[in-house]
Amino acid sequence: MAERGRLGLPGAPGALNTPVPMNLFATWEVDGSSPSCVPRLCSLTLKKLVVFKELEKELISVVIAVKMQGSKRILRSHEIVLPPSGQVETDLALTFSLQYPHFLKREGNKLQIMLQRRKRYKNRTILGYKTLAAGSISMAEVMQHPSEGGQVLSLCSSIKEAPVKAAEIWIASLSSQPIDHEDSTMQAGPKAKSTDNYSEEEYESFSSEQEASDDAVQGQDLDEDDFDVGKPKKQRRSIVRTTSMTRQQNFKQKVVALLRRFKVSDEVLDSEQDPAEHIPEAEEDLDLLYDTLDMEHPSDSGPDMEDDDSVLSTPKPKLRPYFEGLSHSSSQTEIGSIHSARSHKEPPSPADVPEKTRSLGGRQPSDSVSDTVALGVPGPREHPGQPEDSPEAEASTLDVFTERLPPSGRITKTESLVIPSTRSEGKQAGRRGRSTSLKERQAARPQNERANSLDNERCPDARSQLQIPRKTVYDQLNHILISDDQLPENIILVNTSDWQGQFLSDVLQRHTLPVVCTCSPADVQAAFSTIVSRIQRYCNCNSQPPTPVKIAVAGAQHYLSAILRLFVEQLSHKTPDWLGYMRFLVIPLGSHPVARYLGSVDYRYNNFFQDLAWRDLFNKLEAQSAVQDTPDIVSRITQYIAGANCAHQLPIAEAMLTYKQKSPDEESSQKFIPFVGVVKVGIVEPSSATSGDSDDAAPSGSGTLSSTPPSASPAAKEASPTPPSSPSVSGGLSSPSQGVGAELMGLQVDYWTAAQPADRKRDAEKKDLPVTKNTLKCTFRSLQVSRLPSSGEAAATPTMSMTVVTKEKNKKVMFLPKKAKDKDVESKSQCIEGISRLICTARQQQNMLRVLIDGVECSDVKFFQLAAQWSSHVKHFPICIFGHSKATF
């Protein structure tokens, strides 16, 4: 059935990096399935295994097991010896090839990769295996986008509890190919005679007999059921039950396909036929036979298009494409061909936009496709004549999210965040401009995409697996990172998903600066991972530590947040020395609280990037028409990169979000997100809130809190249920939608204030530092928590500050342990300093929260907790400034 090696690697840790090449394959009869099932061949190549934590006490070795969801047959690798610590990073050379039934009319075509160990009883090995960690890949996505460039699959140690990322497997290639019918028919051998007589019980017994050679006892490895998200057993049985009539129909279709396959080509006939023979008559007879068989037993997939196609591709219905904008590629399509799709072309420069287009609210040609759907934000007509970031506008609004985001009409190319749909029919374009109902969206949305969305799966990297970096990113990186022996002094990462980044990248590229244009989370992850790997190669080739590489981050606050999460994730697995190998420079484009803070501690930075000319240039699209009158953009950026040599250590705080469960049987999931800036809170009432995976959203200008919240693109609902040492990095790059109007929120906020330095000296004799817990349980107009240090703050204790605006209840509510508010005041704003920990939840449990963390929105949050310090050794984000010098006014 399968060829499996039971080779144990040498026990010495040094031998772990010597891969043992192994090919494991299995061919199983899958013709006993329903007509909506296509036998396909899954080819998987693994190149590296990384175990981050100890999977079990006294664990000696593990095996890598591969199986299809719902199948009892498993392919296992050799045993991989683990060191005493349980953590290992070893190269692999494993190739798995297994035949599986691909179901077209239901979900569940998932490839499961597991880490297992042999079962033990009283220190004695028994038959069977126990699953320690598992991860899954949707084969439907693999068929749409075969992975030839490699990907990383996270293995979680548990699914019933909060998933914990325990290991990673690096996949070199993964593809799904059709199998020729005649091959599987010949392999079936004598079993073909009894195919028509299969019953449900015979199929079950046949499965258990082969399973006996693998796991010895049917159903003994109950631990694997915890990781199987398949159908109930009765449903699985009904799927494989077929009638003899259907089998006869399939058999005759095979005969037709077989006759077509052995049809002699015209070239051979021309070279071998005798002139006296009448070949056309024979061809007519064959065609008549084909037509007769097709008429008696018609296929549900229509007529055959080409004779040289695979037999499996014609009699079966086609899979509905996930993303219609991409070309329908076969299993052998290379990733590079995807870059030719329209959505992955480099966005046009705003300078190329005609003046007529700019006058219409600054819309670029792609805005009609991108802004109202991907972000759910209104067009410029819904915000007539309101200036961006003007002091009057900020002072006149008391929004739940007080920061103004860039105008919706200027957010372009957001369809490149997730591989998009590029339907260009007039009817579709017309429907996208309005708010469609939830039922229409659910009906128009592919079922597999809904089932595999981040909100449904709660899997760490589910959404990032659907994204592929553009080839342009790698080309730009290869042009900058020339050799392993020498690192560049600086690299500029620009967010080109909006018009500000597109304009800046065009200006910088004309001056041949080291620019990398990123317009999706996959682009950012690819760029940052490549930089880290090049630094690692440099360290491997040189004994001296590298000079810190300056990485300029040009974008809004949410773009810096994406870089921060990658920084925390990558360096949490590195030694503390790595904290000095990179320095970051903040080039603000749009709303940026961190840039405003840097301007408060460095007057030269403030003059460069916080003056009115810079803000107008990147907040008003019309300002680019007079770009020759604006300050020299390139000069400011080059002076900042060259002169900013002082590393300002920005403290990293931790946000733990607890999401609501998707079903009553499912438990809530937790996600850890690092942040350095501001966290803002909104609330969503259940009467109007849509499901977490819905795109239906009301315009942000509605001004009613009870309306459906504007939802960002699916990639913007980032973060994964991972521990603080390895947060997710799938944060979206598009600006999240504006919060709804300043409505009232019934919240309960518990916070702990840390002792001040003076108090600590006084209480130095006490073992436990004094920590005071306070509770706010009232109606809020707004709630904002900032981790940015106070201006001029030295190395103080890690604390946060909270700004709240509360509303009186009966004009006698008590705000903190203070006297009652004046009766003529309805609301009051107060800033609370020195908070070390904070927990916020809605007073009514059915209400869900919307949390904006460093500009990235997270929805469907039951409650969240903020801590002033990130829990791993990566506690600071190094940002370059000119020096700690305030402006003199």
Curated annotation (Swiss-Prot):
Tissues in which the UniProt entry reports expression: Broadly expressed, with greatest levels in skeletal muscle followed by heart, brain, pancreas and testis.
Start and end residues of each stretch annotated as Disordered: 180-246, 293-463, 687-740
UniProt keyword list: Apoptosis, Disease variant, Endoplasmic reticulum, Epilepsy, Host-virus interaction, Mitochondrion, Phosphoprotein
Superkingdom to which the source organism belongs: Eukaryota
Biased amino acid composition, Low complexity: 687-720, 727-737
Positions carrying Phosphoserine: S390, S416, S453, S691, S694
Q: Which GO terms describe its biological process?
A: apoptotic process; autophagosome assembly; endoplasmic reticulum calcium ion homeostasis; mitochondrion-endoplasmic reticulum membrane tethering; protein localization to phagophore assembly site; protein localization to plasma membrane
InterPro entries assigned: Phosphofurin_acidic_CS-1 (IPR019381)
Molecular function terms from GO: transmembrane transporter binding
Start-end of Basic and acidic residues biased regions: 343-358
Tell me its family.
Answer: Belongs to the PACS family.
**What subunit structure does UniProt give?**
Interacts with BID and PKD2. Interacts with SIRT1. Interacts with HDAC1. Interacts with TRPV1. Interacts with WDR37.
* Connected disease: Developmental and epileptic encephalopathy 66: A form of epileptic encephalopathy, a heterogeneous group of severe early-onset epilepsies characterized by refractory seizures, neurodevelopmental impairment, and poor prognosis. Development is normal prior to seizure onset, after which cognitive and motor delays become apparent. DEE66 is an autosomal dominant form characterized by onset of seizures in first days or weeks of life.
Name of the protein in question: Phosphofurin acidic cluster sorting protein 2
* Record organism: Homo sapiens
